[in-house]
A protein has these predicted regions:
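N-terminal pre-Walker A segment at the start of P-loop NTPase domains
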Residues: 1-18, 151-154, 158-160
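Hydrophobic anchor at the beta1->P-loop junction of P-loop NTPases
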Residues: 29
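The conserved Walker
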Residues: 33
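Post-Walker A alpha-helix
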Residues: 40-41
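Conserved P-loop NTPase "ATPase switch" module shared by AAA+ and STAND
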Residues: 73-117
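Acidic, divalent-metal-binding catalytic cores of TOPRIM
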Residues: 110-111, 118, 151-379
């Protein structure tokens, strides 16, 4: 499965309308309990049952892709492997029929989705999954693949229906002071980041350990966190909780991945393959080949670095020295330019968030959500 789709669901009288943009295998839809999620899932179920003749209209923007509810019992077979169960009490899952060019809608009440075996089962399948949940730690998804269902009453407008908006609004300011830097990567990313910042930084040894590392080591201070955004999963919500409990101000810099940043270096500029992946990653990413964009960029840099004599074949631990040149350090500085005094000759996309007292600080949060809704309504 590849490509970007604007999944639009609405009642034919336009009283209820949702539009969600998806371009990765997993998209998360969250929100307060009872607001919209179950209603949206029921809208899809009605559409499929009535074969488009009911009160619900649905479109993916492509006649090659079908959208349908996922109920688990139809698509997957539960079976015991050697009579044993997994630690979470569930059994191995096996596809009865591999999906092809499908977008599945999955409700959080479906118990089958909560085990690690379900996460394994949907990997490398020719399908996208829109999952309605408030906590899904076992799956890998990007921070901007999370959508929130809100009522416009939440932003001060009364009497208008629900809408789906991206859950996390970026911080539009600058990093102003921090006591310490934590990088989730223990090898390449951290070492190059140290050279770019000219200071020693800590590591959490991976995204999975990031929250526990911060919870254990910091309180009543401000910190700067740098992590791969491609598989950030539910860490944003957990950081908000830690920020409130530990009285932390957390600046969070999220590039797609370290490999994504390094591929912007001039040494790869002659590679048409690299240019295509950086300029139009949506058309290159295929769920049957990679779980996340991070894995895609890692494969690209390994393949392309093997063709260049001036640098070693890219490995996260070995052969790192050739990536410690001023040119690569300058490339990495491109994601640090919101820190006072740091400049770069490169331009690399990344996101900056500021979490304080458990909340994302973005200026006027309500106005930003209203602006997004206005843009959607203009379509």
């Amino acid at each position: 499965m590849k490509g970007e789709y604007n999944v639009t669901l609405n009642t034919k009288n336009n009283v209820i309308k949702y539009t969600i943009s998806i371009s990765r295998q997993i998209t998360i839809v969250c929100g307060k309990s009872g607001i919209g999620k179950t209603l949206l899932h029921d809208m899809v179920a009605e559409y499929c049952k009535m074969e488009g003749r009911g009160a619900v209209e649905i479109s993916s923007g492509s006649d090659k892709v079908s959208i349908e509810p996922f109920d688990g019992s139809v698509a997957l077979l539960r079976e015991v492997e050697n009579g044993k169960k997994f630690k979470d009490g569930t059994t191995k899952l096996k596809w009865l029929e591999k999906p092809s060019q499908k977008i599945f809608i999955i409700d959080e009440d479906l118990i089958i989705t909560k085990g690690i075996n379900f996460a394994d089962a949907i990997r490398y399948t020719d399908a996208y999954y829109i999952i309605f949940t408030r906590d899904l730690r076992l799956h890998k998804y990007m921070y901007n693949s999370v959508w929130d269902i809100i009522t416009l009453e939440d932003v001060g407008i009364v009497g208008i229906d629900n809408r789906a908006v991206r859950a996390y609004n970026e911080f539009n300011g600058y990093v102003k002071g921090y006591s310490e830097v934590i990088h989730e990567d223990y090898a390449t990313g951290r070492e190059i980041c140290e050279l770019a910042l000219c200071e020693k930084i800590k590591t959490s040894y991976g995204n999975l350990n990031l929250v526990s590392h911060i919870k254990k080591n910091y309180k009543n201070t401000s910190i700067l966190v740098i992590a791969d955004g491609a598989n950030f999963s539910n860490i944003m919500e957990r950081l908000k909780k830690v920020s409130k409990r530990k009285q932390l101000l957390i600046y969070l810099i999220l590039p797609e991945s370290t490999e994504y940043v390094l591929l912007h270096n001039a040494i790869f500029s002659e590679s048409r393959n690299v240019s295509e992946y950086l300029l139009d990653p949506v058309s290159k990413y295929n769920t049957e080949n990679w779980i996340t964009y991070e894995k895609m960029y890692e494969q690209v840099i390994i393949e392309e670095s093997s063709k260049i004599d001036e640098i070693n074949n890219y490995e996260k631990v070995e052969g790192l020295e050739t990536y410690k040149t001023e040119s690569f350090i300058d490339t990495y500085r491109a994601i640090l330019t919101r820190i006072d005094g740091i400049k770069s000759s490169y331009n690399v996309k990344y996101s900056l968030y500021k979490i304080e007292n458990g909340k994302l600080m973005v200026g006027d949060l309500h106005s930003s959500k209203i602006n997004e809704l206005d843009k959607e309504n203009e379509k």
